[in-house]
Amino acid sequence: MIQDTIADMLTRIRNANAMRIYTVCMPMTSVAREIAVILETEGWIDSWKEASVNSLILRLKYRGAKQQPILTGLRRVSRSGCRVYVSAKEVPKVLGGMGTAIISTSKGIMTDREARNHRLGGEVICLIW
């Protein structure tokens, strides 16, 4: 059984990117679904869909003739053994605003930009660039 579903999701995306695979299948949780929505709205993935009750399929994006991945890096920040919380003033900017931080706040899971606009802090789930 998977202990950290978010880390598993990020690892599956990272491995598929390295192999230039277009679709990734993973177990579906409510947090994974919300992260998939954020990845799609921010333009990091092409699309996502629920394949069944228990699985989620992401379609990854590549650019150019050499099929370079849009996602160059994914990093899990807050883990089960070491939680990382930030205040509204400490919300991280990834690569000076070129990347995205996904933060779990009291108003739900959102990007770093949304958290700054709403003046919310929370748990930093992962960084994407």
Curated annotation (Swiss-Prot):
One Gene Ontology biological process: translation
Keywords: Chloroplast, Plastid, Ribonucleoprotein, Ribosomal protein, RNA-binding, rRNA-binding
Domain of life: Eukaryota
Quaternary data: Part of the 30S ribosomal subunit.
Family of this protein: Belongs to the universal ribosomal protein uS8 family.
InterPro entries, per database record: Ribosomal_uS8 (IPR000630), Ribosomal_uS8_CS (IPR047863), Ribosomal_uS8_sf (IPR035987)
Organism: Nephroselmis olivacea
Name of the protein described by the UniProt record: Small ribosomal subunit protein uS8c
